[in-house]
């Protein structure tokens, strides 16, 4: 796996699924391929994206700044600086300085990542802030190692939280989660359907599913009534893809 592929993988792992994630993936690909060279416009676009947490925006801004060539005196962006200040915690800043000194001795991406993984996400963000604010310099490879370690820490805690939700025995939370998943699956089906004749069928199934979820929420239904809703939808989607000559079995 190439270095940039690895960076893209880690960064995208902390972005919530949805149309915005696809858009960010495209921007990262363009930036890494050298196709997008207007850092100012890129940062302005990032700043105004909804849904993303300030820290995720800060990490993306840091990655864009590392990758896109820019004039020497280009102003640092406040939204990135604020996100990478470790919540203003002096403890994070002390650890960030110690980590920075260790990173100065590293020359490889993997070496930097290994060193960084023993620190908390707050200290890692502060260390990125030091580098972003030009208070310290490391090689791009080492900076990317720091980015990936930070993303791994964040993704780990997101995964723990997600696992808690998936394994919860609370029927109301499970019911709502199934309805949310069915609704987002239906939305994805509508986006994929396009305008062919068979597409009308897929659109109809998706539309009915969304109406059903809406009705279930409006009138309040038994928690078990949503069981299998998403799987039914995915079966419909796969049947539609088969007719279109597309074989994708890994949606589940």
From Swiss-Prot:
SUPFAM superfamilies to which the protein is assigned, alphabetical: Influenza virus matrix protein M1 (SSF48145)
The keyword Chloroplast is assigned to this record: no
Compartments, record wording: Virion membrane; Host nucleus
GO terms (BP aspect): viral budding from plasma membrane
Primary location: virion
Keyword RNA-binding belongs to the record: yes
Signal sequence extent: none
Residue segments, region RNP-binding: 165-252
Keywords: Host nucleus, Membrane, RNA-binding, Viral matrix protein, Virion
Region (Membrane-binding): 1-164
Pfam families listed in its UniProt record: Flu_M1, Flu_M1_C
An example Gene Ontology molecular-function term: structural constituent of virion
Its membrane topology: Peripheral membrane protein
Location of the motif Nuclear localization signal: 101-105
GO cellular component terms attached to this protein's record: host cell nucleus; membrane; virion membrane
InterPro entries for the chain: Flu_matrix_M1 (IPR036039), Flu_matrix_M1_C (IPR013188), Flu_matrix_M1_N (IPR001561), Flu_matrix_M1_N_sub1 (IPR015423), Flu_matrix_M1_N_sub2 (IPR015799), INFV_M1 (IPR037533)
Misc note: Most abundant protein in virion. When expressed alone can form virus-like particles in transfected cells.
Quaternary structure, from the entry: Homodimer and homomultimer. Interacts with NEP. Binds ribonucleocapsid by both interacting with genomic RNA and NP protein. May interact with HA and NA. Cannot bind NP without genomic RNA.
Family: Belongs to the influenza viruses Matrix protein M1 family.
Role summary: Plays critical roles in virus replication, from virus entry and uncoating to assembly and budding of the virus particle. M1 binding to ribonucleocapsids (RNPs) in nucleus seems to inhibit viral transcription. Interaction of viral NEP with M1-RNP is thought to promote nuclear export of the complex, which is targeted to the virion assembly site at the apical plasma membrane in polarized epithelial cells. Interactions with NA and HA may bring M1, a non-raft-associated protein, into lipid rafts. Forms a continuous shell on the inner side of the lipid bilayer in virion, where it binds the RNP.
Protein name in the entry: Matrix protein 1
Organism: Influenza A virus (strain A/Swine/Tennessee/24/1977 H1N1)
């Amino acid at each position: 796996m190439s270095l940039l592929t690895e960076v893209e993988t880690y960064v995208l792992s902390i972005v919530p699924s949805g149309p915005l994630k696809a858009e960010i993936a495209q921007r990262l690909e363009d930036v890494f391929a050298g196709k997008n060279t207007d850092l100012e416009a890129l940062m302005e676009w990032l700043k105004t994206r909804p849904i993303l947490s300030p820290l995720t925006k800060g990490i993306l801004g840091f990655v864009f700044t590392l990758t896109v060539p820019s004039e020497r005196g280009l102003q640092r962006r406040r939204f990135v600086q604020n996100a990478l200040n470790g919540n203003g915690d002096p403890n994070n800043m002390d650890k960030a300085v110690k980590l920075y000194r260790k990173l100065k001795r590293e020359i490889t991406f993997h070496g930097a990542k290994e060193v960084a993984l023993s620190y908390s996400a707050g200290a890692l963000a502060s260390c990125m802030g030091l580098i972003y604010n030009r208070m310290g310099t490391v090689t791009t490879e080492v900076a990317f190692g720091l980015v990936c370690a930070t993303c791994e820490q964040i993704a780990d805690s997101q995964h723990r939280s997600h696992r808690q939700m998936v394994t919860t025995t609370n029927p109301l939370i499970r019911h709502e989660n199934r309805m949310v998943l069915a609704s987002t699956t239906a939305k994805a089906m509508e986006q994929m359907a396009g305008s062919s004749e068979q597409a009308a069928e897929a659109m109809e199934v998706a539309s009915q599913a969304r109406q059903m979820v809406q009705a279930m929420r409006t009138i309040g239904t038994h928690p078990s009534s949503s069981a299998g809703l998403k799987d039914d939808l995915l079966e419909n989607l796969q049947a539609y893809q088969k007719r279109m000559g597309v074989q994708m079995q890994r949606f589940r």
